[in-house]
């Protein structure tokens, strides 16, 4: 009887042990940056630096059971193909997923340059918010007489991912000038 109870207890506790928590957020962030930065520097001019504020958790990694569903959008500025010249650098997107063995990898089929990232600005200044399929971003557009280096009109815009993985502009609004 004791063996039967011990066996039942084992099978009751085992699923709880398997539904372990994900690594700490700091470790997840570190691995996302490492993966996205390696990808960005491989396809663009070297020197791309990614920080935690450029990551949006589309589907966060919370437990070992949901890690294969985890998805992160990472924005980075770079010149894909290292074409050079003014105006060739801009904001790009990499989609980082979690693979077997807790490997964080960029999915090139859902990342720049394969997909379209319809940002109305050359450089995104911040991620305002996100859902599983939208990004709300801010950046600056060029006024008529702005030099190529320095856009001056602040805009907030929303991109939504379509069924092909392209990030399409669905809304844009001007923000009041800061005084």
Model regions and ranges:
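Exposed acidic/polar residues on beta-strands and adjacent loops within beta-sheet cores, strongest
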Residues: 20-179
């Amino acid at each position: 009887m004791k063996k039967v109870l011990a066996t039942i207890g084992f099978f009751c506790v085992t699923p709880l042990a398997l539904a372990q928590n994900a690594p700490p957020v700091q470790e997840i962030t570190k691995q996302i940056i490492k993966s996205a930065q390696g990808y960005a520097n491989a396809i663009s001019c070297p020197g791309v630096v990614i920080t935690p504020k450029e990551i949006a958790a589309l589907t966060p990694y919370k437990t070992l059971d949901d890690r294969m569903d985890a998805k992160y959008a990472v924005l980075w500025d770079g010149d894909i193909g290292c074409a050079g010249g003014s105006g060739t650098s801009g904001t790009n997107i990499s989609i980082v997923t979690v693979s077997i063995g807790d490997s964080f990898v960029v999915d090139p089929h859902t990342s720049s340059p394969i997909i379209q990232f319809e940002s109305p600005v050359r450089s995104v200044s911040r991620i305002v918010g996100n859902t599983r399929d939208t990004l709300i971003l801010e950046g600056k557009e060029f006024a008529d007489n702005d030099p190529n280096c320095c856009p001056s009109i602040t805009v907030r815009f929303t991109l939504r991912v379509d069924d092909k993985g392209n990030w399409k502009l669905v809304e844009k609004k001007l923000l009041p000038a800061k005084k």
